[in-house]
Amino acid sequence: MTSIIYVGMDVHTTNFTFCCYTADSDRGFAVAQTEPDYRQVIKYMECVQKQRGEECKFVCGYEAGCLGYSLYHQLTRCGVDCVILAPSTMHQEKGKRIKTDRRDAENIARRLAF
């Protein structure tokens, strides 16, 4: 059976931060930070699939911002399912006001899963 893994990406011009999430888990996993290059996204997904040891379908997403559609187009040309989320859809939990790239990536992955 193929697992669906949601990859939240907090993207900036200086770096990308990734976090994976599955619909049956309550916590993100495989957090990583890389240089800002779409090939790093593909490499990251290959590493996650290898670690899991099973066939995986990935759905990636990032919040609309400075990169616009460029990352989206690069990933979809490579066959990667990618979604751009509007900032207004990003729910902030009360009490978690400290923003970090890791938290943002996990939040994006969670939004993709649900």
Label the model's feature ranges.
Residues 1-114:
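Phosphate- and other anionic-substrate recognition elements at nucleic-acid/protein interfaces
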